[in-house]
């Protein structure tokens, strides 16, 4: 669930539940990845919609590091909204594919980092 977003910061919250658990009593890694991806994608979607242009988005690559079991409430944060806005604008202005890397950090209720994700996005203005 997107819980906060502005031009620079986004937050997506994820609660440990039966449906997203793994056999080890924590949040399944792929569910964490979906929340992390959304925390980066929300900037791109917002700026594309604001531009009123058709722009395609594609994840080219992603990397993840898991530091602690994800239990309870986990919040994924991305603070690269300005970079995302610039990339969308460059894709529209140049008509060329633009790539950028956006990072999302997941923290638990104690503030400890449970996982970090980096997504490499490709943006390209669609031809009319």
Question: Positions of the model-derived regions?
Answer:
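Catalytic strand-loop segment that frames the active site of acyl-thioester-processing enzymes
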Residues: 1-27
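Short structured motifs
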Residues: 1-2, 60-66, 87-89
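Beta-strand secondary-structure signal
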Residues: 11-13, 63, 75-79, 101-103, ...
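Hydrophobic residues in beta-strands and at strand termini
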Residues: 14-16, 66, 80, 123
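Hot-dog-fold acyl-thioester-processing enzymes
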Residues: 19-41, 54
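Residues at secondary-structure transition points
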Residues: 23-31, 65, 69, 95
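Hydrophobic beta-strand-centered segment that forms part of the acyl-chain substrate-binding groove
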Residues: 43-82
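HotDog/MaoC-like acyl-thioester-processing domains
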Residues: 70-71, 81-128
